[in-house]
Amino acid sequence: MMQPKRTKFRKQFKGRIHGNSKGGTDLNFGAFGLKALEPERVTARQIEAARRAITRHMKRAGRVWIRIFPDLPVTSKPTEVRMGKGKGSVDYWACRVAPGRVMFELDGVPEDVAREALRLGAAKLPIKTRFIQRIAE
């Protein structure tokens, strides 16, 4: 699973996702992509599950680019522990995804294969998504 090699601080504030994505809204690498339509935190496990579903359907053909990275540490306190006594330890890593953000890109496969692969990957994610493709020039 993806997580940063090192960070300046171990824990971060929860934060909010305001407005649309400021960058990463266009296809940069592949011919097909999966774009987020709503704001949400996506965990490293969800990203990995989607990646596995996509590559499994593509049967190792083509190429997959993951355009999001889980760099947000999410903390939690153990069960049945009273409030207070400081912030909990890091439980998992997540990524804030704003509407309009391209999360996955594919290339080297036909459109019908790419559409089905990204549909299977989108089922593993907690947000509504849209299939996008590069406009033929």
From Swiss-Prot:
**UniProt xrefs under Gene3D superfamilies:** Ribosomal protein L10e/L16
What is a single molecular function from GO for this protein? rRNA binding
Write out the entry's keywords from A to Z.
Ribonucleoprotein, Ribosomal protein, RNA-binding, rRNA-binding, tRNA-binding
Cellular component GO terms, alphabetical: cytosolic large ribosomal subunit
Q: Which InterPro entries match?
A: Ribosomal_uL16, Ribosomal_uL16_bact-type, Ribosomal_uL16_CS, Ribosomal_uL16_dom, Ribosomal_uL16_sf
In terms of domain of life, where is this protein from?
Bacteria
Cited SUPFAM superfamilies = Ribosomal protein L16p/L10e
Single GO BP term: translation
Give yes or no: UniProt keyword Signal.
no
Q: Which NCBIfam families match?
A: rplP_bact (TIGR01164)
User: How is the subunit organization of this protein annotated in UniProt?
Assistant: Part of the 50S ribosomal subunit.
Q: Which HAMAP family match?
A: Ribosomal_uL16
Its family remark reads:
Belongs to the universal ribosomal protein uL16 family.
**What does this protein's UniProt record list under function?**
Binds 23S rRNA and is also seen to make contacts with the A and possibly P site tRNAs.
UniProt protein name: Large ribosomal subunit protein uL16
Record gene name = rplP
